[in-house]
Amino acid sequence: MRICCLCLAAMFAGVVFATDMDQKAKVIATVQTVGAGVAEITCDDMGSWKFSVSSGQDAGRDVVTVRIDSPVEAMPPKFGVFFRVSGAGVQNVWVSASDRDGCHLWPQLWWGGRFAKYNSQLARDTPIAVGFNSTERAPVALACSEAFHPLTFGLYADDRTCEIIGRCEFFQRSAAKMKSYACSVMLDRRNGSFADAVRDCTRWIVERNGFTEAPVPEAAFDPLYSTWYAYLQDVRAEEIEDEAREAASLGMKTMILDDGWQKVDSASFYSATGDWMPVQSRFPDMKTHVAAVHEAGLKYMLWLAVPYIGDESKVWDRFKDKVLFIRGDKSPGRIAVLDPRFPEVREYLIRTYERVVGEWGFDGVKLDFIDEFVQPGDDPAAKDGFAGRDCRSVPEAVDRLMKDVLTRLRAIKPDVLVEFRQHYMGPAILQYGNMMRVADCPADPCANRKRMCDLRLTSGGIAVHSDMLVWSNDESPEGAALPILNVLYSTIQYSMALKKINPAHRAVIRHWLAFSQRHRDALLKGAFVPHHAENGYTWIESENEGERIAAAYAENACVKAGSPSRTVYVINATGTDVVIVDSTLPRMAEMFNTIGERTGAVRIESGVSRVHIPVSGYAKLAPVGKL
C-alpha cells in the first residue's frame, strides 16, 4: 500500500478558496491516489483540530482516510473529501434513497437543491453512489465508511468539463463533542457490473466497520400477511384470528399485527403511544389471542413504534424530560421522541419488547420509526451537561439499544424475527434485524419492484420483504398477479382483507405463493441480478445450481435464457402476451397461465425470439427433446 500523510494545523496560510460554482469549502489539503487522481480535503474552520490524511489501495480501489484529532473535546468541524475523475461511460447515478425518482446524474451546480443532495446516517439509507451506463457497467462507484453520523454525499457532473465529481461532507449537522474521529472514502474505478459495484460497496462498508450481520432464521423468508393496509388502525382480535386462518389456507406462514392494537382514539396520530399495552375492548387477552393465531398455523409478529411517547400515555410524565424533541404545542396531541442516551429509556423499551415475546408469546417484532432518533439542531443535553445520560452520541446510543434488543430477545427466543424497513436501512442496520421491508408504496408495483431490487443489492444475507401487496378487487386475475410478479424475488407480504377478496384472486395468490415456495432457493438466495436500474429494472434474473428464473417487466426487455444445464422459467410480467427471449440453442417452452394451468408448448429457436407467453403467466424452458 502506498501511503501519503499530511499533518495540518490552522497555521496554513496558502489555502485555496473554492468558487461559488464548486459549492465547497476551502481546500486545506490534497492527496494523490492511484486511480482517482487528486483527492481534496476541504474545511472552512479547523479550530483546534489537526487533520491527518492518507491514501492507499484496497483490492484495486482507491481509499482516502481522514483522521482528525483535538487536544480537548470539541464539536467536530465541517469537512469534506472530493474526487474529480473522467465522466466517460457515466450516464446515470444510483443511490439507495427510495424517495428519489430515477437514477439522475445531477449537475454539480445543483448541489444545493434538496432533490440533488443525498444524505445517510445510522438509520437512513446507505452512503453509496454508483455511476453507471446503459451497458450496465459502473466506471465510478463511491462509498464511505461513515455508517453512524449524518453524511452528505453524491456523484455529480461538472457542467463545464463533464468530469464526475465525488463528494462526501461530514458533520454538516451538529454532533456530540469528541476528541478524535476517522473515516474512509472509497472510489472504485474498476468498471465492474452495476450490481456487483453496489454489492461490493456494501461489503466494503460492512468490513471496514467490522459489522456482523444478525442471524437470519429460515422463517424470515416465509410469506406473510400484514394487517396494515387491510385494516389500518381498526384491528380487533376476533377478526384478525379469522384472517389468520384465511392466510394460512392460502399458504402464508407469518402474520404481523400492525398499528391499532394499542389505541382506540387519540388527539393526534401517535399522542397515545408509549404504554404499549393492548386496548381491552379490542384485545381483551393478548396471550390467548396470540395462541389462536398460532393455532391457525402462523407465526405472529407485533408492530411497535420505537421512539415515540405521546402526552396521552401513562408514561408521559415519567419520560417527558428524557426526550430529544417534542412535536406539537397543544395538549393533548403532543408527541415526543425519546432520548436513547438515557439508560432508563433503553431499558424501558427493551423490557417492553421482552414482554411482547416472553409473556404474550409473539415470534418477533416489527420495529418502526427508528430513523426518528435524530439529534436536533440544539442538543437538549448540552444545557444540563449530559446529566443522566451514559453516552453523548445519539447514533451510539441507538446502536447500543438495537444490539441489546436483539441480544435479549434472542435469549428468550433464539429464532426471533425482527423487521425494519426503508428508509432506516444501511450497513449498520444489518446487525440488528433479519427482515428488511420495502418502504410504503401501496398499489404501486413498479416502486415496489425498484425498491426491492435496491434492498436486495444492499442488504447482505438478511431477508428482503416487499411492501404489503394490495390491488383493486375488480382487477382481472392477470392484473391481480402483476403486483405479485413485480416482487417475486423478495419475501412477499400481503395486506388485503382476505375474507372479502375476489375468488378469482384467491386462486392467483394460492398459485404464486406455491410457485414462490417451490423455487424459494433460486428466487431468494440465488445469484440475483436486476437489470437496467435506470429504467426501474426492466428484467431480473436469479439462479442456483439447478434452475434459473428470469422475469420481464417491459415488452422491450430482452431476457437471456442462460445455460442449458439449468431448468429455466421465464415470467411474463409485461402486461402483454409477448416476451423477448435470447436463447443460445433451440428449446421447447411449456406455457402456463397466471393460475398455473398448462396452456400448450412451442419451440423457440436459437437467437432472439418474440415468444408468446400467457399474460402474467410463465414458460418453462428445456432443450429440445428434454421437456
Regions found by a protein language model. Give the residues of each.
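N-terminal accessory beta-strand-rich subdomains and adjacent acidic, glycine-rich linkers
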Residues: 20-207, 211, 578-583, 588-591, ...
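An acidic-aromatic substrate-binding cleft motif
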Residues: 205-246, 250-254, 262-263
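Active-site groove signature of glycoside hydrolases
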Residues: 251-261, 349-383
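Active-site-adjacent "subsite" loops/lids of carbohydrate-active enzymes
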Residues: 215, 222, 229, 233, ...
